[in-house]
Amino acid sequence: MNTKEINRVLQDTFNKELTEGKKRHIVFWYDEAGEFIEDIDELNLEGVRIWKLTPHNMFATKLEVEKNDVNSNFLIYANMAKPSAREDWLLDVYKYSQEFATDKMTVMMRELGITNDAALRDVFKKYTKFFKSKEREALFKSFSVPEYTEEQIDLVVLASLCKCNIVNLDEVIKALFREQLKETNKYWENIRKFGNEETFWNLVEKTYGYNLQDKSINSLLIFFLLTNVSETLSGDIPKTWQPYISAIPMNAIVFMNQFMNHSADEVIYNELANTVEKQVKVTEHLQSKEIKDYITSDTFCCFDTNIITYITKQLMNAIHDYTSYIEIIAARRKLHWFSVFRNEYEALYQAIQLFQQIYEMGNAITESQPFDLFKAYESKYHNIDTAYRKFYVAFDQIEDKDGFRALRDKVENIYTNVYINDLAIKWSDALEGEQEEYWPIAGLESQHTFYRSFVQPFVNKEERVFVIISDALRYEVAKELSNMLNVERKASTDIVAMQGVLPSYTDLGMATLLPYKSITFNENAEVYVNDYKASSTENRATILSKHYKDSTAIQYKDLAAMNRQQFRDVFSGKKVSYIYHNVIDARGDHAATEHEVFHAVEQTLKDIRSLVDQLINTVSASNIVITADHGFIYNRDTLQASDKVKKDFLNTDIEKRRFIISSESNSIEGTMNFSMDYVLGEGSGKYVKVPRGANRFAVQGTGANYVHGGAMLQEIVVPVIKFKNDRSKSSKNDVRKVEVKLTSLTRKITNSITYLEFFQTEKIEGKKTPLRLKVYFTDEEGNRISNENIIIADSQSSKPEDRTFKEKFVLKSMTYDKTKKYYLVLEDEEEAVENIYEKVAFPIDIAITNDFGF
C-alpha cells in the first residue's frame, strides 16, 4: 500500500455514512514507529483536516477539535505511542471517533500480494531500517519476483542495496567486488546499515561454501579466486590456500568464469586478481610447479607471465620443441589473460615460426638456379620475411620489452646473419653464374610486360578493370592481403609473382606498369614513357588514355577525401583505372620514419581492403588487379660498415644505396652488373650495378635499413593479385565458416562435472574460415548454469584428431528438475545478431552433492 492507496482507504473511511447521531468523522492514526511520517504531508483528503498530534499539543488539539472547529472531519496523526487512558487528554474525543491502524510491513506485504503468510512478516520486520527510505522501497518493488520466500526477500533487499539489475546472489557479489578497489565499499556499507550482515554471510556460505571465521569482502574475494585456481592447478595446493578453497566449488567456479570473462568486468577483475596475487604469493608458490601443472590456469596473470618466460628461455636455449610451444600458445588463446598478453604471445609465435622454418631447412638455403630460387621464394622462403615482419609489429607494441630484448636480438641475428645472408650468397652466386649481365630471368613472368599480360586482356574484351598499385607492396605482404581478400567476400582471388625490373626503384617500376612503346632516360636520369615524363599522376593518366581512351589515373589519398558521388564521377565512363597508393615507401624512404615501415604495412593492408570494398559497393567493380612497383629489404638493426660497398668511380647517372645506373659497363668489386637493354631497348648503353646480396652502397642521404633498388628476392619478386568479384548465384566462391559438431554420444547430464567432445568437420582452406564459439549450459529461461568454454575451430590439419576438442563443463550446484529442459548453447562469438550457432536439449539429473560429484 503506497501513499495513493492509503489516501484511498482513508477517503473511503471519511465518506462512510454517519451513524449513531454523529455529525462528523474523527479518525486517530497512531504511528509510533514513524513509518509513514514522510507520507502524511502527501495525503490529499477531500473535506478532511489533517492535524498532527504531539505530546506537547494535546490541550491545543482538544481545544481545536471541541471548541474552535466543531464541524470539520479530522484525521489526527500522531507519531507517538497511543497514550494510556489516564494520560490521554483526548480520551473523550477518542471514544466517539475511530482509529486507523497500519504498519509498513503490513502495507508492504499487502502490496506485494502476500496476505496469508505470517512467517514472512518477521522477514520483512528484519528490514525495518531498509523500508524507511522511499527510494529503497521503490527499488525493492521494482524487481519482478514470481514468488516470495524468505531467501527471495533477502536477495531482493541485497540486490536493491547493491543497485543490481536482477535478483541474483552472483550479481550482488559482483557489485561488491566492483566496489572493493575503492576507498570505501559503499554497497557493503549499505548492507551493514540497512540490510543484515548475518543473513548475507549465511547466503554466501549456503551458495558457495564460504565459511571462514574472519569474514570480509576481501577474504571472500580470495576464497573465490583460490577456489577457481584449485580447479585447474595440478599437484598439491599450498597449505595456506586450503582454508580458502570451497568444499562445494561448483557455484564458485561458475561465478568466477562468468565474472572474469564478462567484458564489462574485465578491467576490474584484472585489478582485483593482481592485488590478491601479491597477497597470497602466487608467484612464489609456482616456483615448485612445472608449466604443465597450470597450462589451463588463468585466474592470475602470473600463469601467463611464467609461460611466456618459459617459452622465451626455451627459444633462447635453442630447444627446438616448436610444436609444443605452439600448442601451449593455442591453449592460452582461449583463456582470460590472453588479450592482455596478446602482443607477447604473438611475438613468441612469430619468433617460433621464423626459427622453425630456418631450422627445418637445415639453417641453409639450397643452392639452385635463379629460376628455382625465385620459385622457392614465391612458395616458401617469403614466409620467413612475414614472420620477421610480424614479430616486430608485435614486439613494438609490447609495453615492457625487457623480457623480450634478448629474444629480439636472436630474431635479428638469425634473420639477418643466417637467412638473409645465406639467401644473399646463394642468390647472388646463381645470378652471376647464369645471368651474365642479362636481365630478366628466362621463364618468369616479367614486370615490364605487366600491362600486356594483366590489363590488355580486359581491354580486348572491353571489360572494366581497376589497377591498384601500392608502392613497395612486397610479395609476402601481398600474399597476406590476398588471403584476407579471399575470405572477406564472395570472389575469386589469385596471386602470382612477377620478376621486377632492375633496378627495383619507383620511377622505373611505375613506368613499366604502364602501356609503353619506349622507356627512356633524359639527361637528368628522369624516366620517360612514350616521350612523357612518367613520374606524375597526370602524365600517367595521359599515357594510359593515349593507349586506350577510356582510361584514367588517380591517387588513393585523393579518392579517400571524396564523397560517394565524387567517387562515382571519377570512374564514370572509364574502362581502365589506375589507383596509386603510397604508404609503405613514403614511411620507409625517410631515415626518421623507416623503423615504422612494418606498421605502414599494417595500414596498407587496411587501406587496400577498404578500397576494394568501396570499389565494389560504390561503382560495382568486378575486376581488380593489385600490384606494386617493387619490394623492399628492411632490417631493424643498424648496418655494420662491412655491409656497405664503396664506389670506385664517379661517372654515374643515378646513385642510390642499392643501385647505380651508369654508362660504364665495367664491374665494381662486390657488385653485379646488368645491361638495361631489356627495358630501354637494344643499344641503350645503360648498365645497372647492384651490390651482391643485401649490402648497400656507401652514399649520403636517406636511411639505410629500409632499401630497395637491388636484385634481392625481397625487392624483385613483385606480386600481382587478380581479384574478381562474384555476383552469381553459384556457391563456388561463397565464404563460409567451418562447421563444428557435438560428437559426444550422451545427451543427458548426470554429474556436476561433464566432459563433451566437439569436432571441426573440415580443415581451414580456400574459402573456409575459422569459427569461434562460446559454449555453455542454460535453463529454459536462458539463465546460465555452467561455466563457459571457448572453441577456436581454425585447424588447417587434415588429421581428424587435430580437429577434436574436449571441453570440461562445471554445472552449478542447485536443484535440477528432471521434467524441465536445459540446453547446451553454442554461440558464434563473431555474430552480433543471429549468434546462436546451435542449441542442444540436455536433460539434467544430478543428485545434490557437497563435492565435485565423483
Swiss-Prot record:
<comment type="similarity">
    <text>Belongs to the alkaline phosphatase superfamily.</text>
</comment>
<dbReference type="Pfam" id="PF08665">
    <property type="entry name" value="PglZ"/>
</dbReference>
<dbReference type="GO" id="GO:0051607">
    <property type="term" value="P:defense response to virus"/>
</dbReference>
<protein>
    <recommendedName>
        <fullName>Alkaline phosphatase-like protein PglZ</fullName>
    </recommendedName>
</protein>
<dbReference type="InterPro" id="IPR017850">
    <property type="entry name" value="Alkaline_phosphatase_core_sf"/>
</dbReference>
<dbReference type="InterPro" id="IPR014060">
    <property type="entry name" value="PglZ"/>
</dbReference>
<comment type="function">
    <text>BREX systems (bacteriophage exclusion) provide immunity against bacteriophage. A core protein of a type 1 BREX system. This system allows phage adsorption but prevents phage DNA replication, without degradation of the phage DNA. Methylation of bacterial DNA by PglX probably guides self/non-self discrimination. When the brxA-brxB-brxC-pglX and pglZ-brxL operons are transformed into a susceptible B.subtilis strain (BEST7003) they confer resistance to bacteriophages SPbeta, SP16, Zeta, phi3T and SP02 and partial protection to phages SP01 and SP82G (these include lytic and temperate phage).</text>
</comment>
<dbReference type="InterPro" id="IPR013973">
    <property type="entry name" value="PglZ_dom"/>
</dbReference>
<keyword id="KW-0051">Antiviral defense</keyword>
